[in-house]
């Protein structure tokens, strides 16, 4: 969810540990980098562009990436994401997952739990939990879980759908 205001204001919403505007600018840049928000540089006023109901309308993928940037800007130790890449292409998704792993300027590197419906997203995870009837029935890497018939079946159904 984004709010009417500048890109910068949206990203810094909930951030309370900044001591200077220079530190805020650095935090915004790092969050935008990890969340693959390079489109922000092309906005009329960059991070100062007003978005939302009172401003520029963004695509679903752009909104999704800015929301992720905001979540990263608070420097969480645990990051919970619900299908965060559903509106993104696979290349952008891979870029973001790698950036989440490696971090940038003190951001990223958090333990990240995410739900995913695309097999391509699941395959990028370090560890996958298989749920059946609300219970964890297996956990391992995607490659190892592919040895289980119920997991293979689930992945093939998702590929088709």
Question: What is the predicted role of each segment?
Answer:
Residues 1-3, 117-118:
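Catalytic "switch" loops of ABC-type ATPases
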Residues 3, 28, 37-66, 84, ...:
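ABC-fold ATPase nucleotide-binding domain signature/coupling loops
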Residues 3-4, 8-16:
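Short helical segment in ABC ATPase nucleotide-binding domains corresponding to the A-loop/adjacent helical element
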Residues 13-14, 19-21, 43-46, 91, ...:
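C-terminal portion of ABC ATPase nucleotide-binding domains
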Residues 17-33:
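Short coil-to-helix "N-cap" segments within the ABC nucleotide-binding domain's helical subdomain
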Residues 68, 115:
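Hydrophobic anchor residue at the start of the ABC signature
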Residues 73-77:
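A short, proline-enriched helix->beta-strand linker immediately N-terminal to the Walker B motif
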Residues 79-83:
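Catalytic Walker B motif of ABC-type/P-loop ATPase nucleotide-binding domains
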């Amino acid at each position: 969810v984004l709010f009417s205001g500048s890109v910068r204001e949206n990203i810094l919403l909930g951030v309370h540990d900044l001591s200077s505007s220079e530190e805020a600018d650095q935090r915004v840049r790092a969050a935008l980098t990890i969340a693959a928000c390079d489109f922000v540089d092309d906005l009329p006023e960059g991070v100062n562009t007003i978005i939302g109901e009172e401003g520029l309308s963004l695509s679903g993928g752009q909104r999704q990436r800015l929301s992720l940037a905001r979540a990263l800007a608070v420097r969480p130790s645990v990051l919970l994401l619900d299908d965060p890449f559903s509106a993104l292409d696979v290349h952008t998704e891979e870029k973001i997952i790698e950036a989440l792993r490696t971090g940038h300027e003190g951001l990223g590197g958090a333990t990240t739990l995410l739900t995913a419906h695309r097999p391509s997203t699941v395959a990028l995870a370090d560890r996958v939990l298989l749920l059946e009837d609300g219970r964890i029935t297996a956990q391992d890497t995607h490659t190892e879980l592919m040895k289980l018939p119920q997991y293979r079946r689930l992945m093939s159904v998702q590929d088709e759908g």
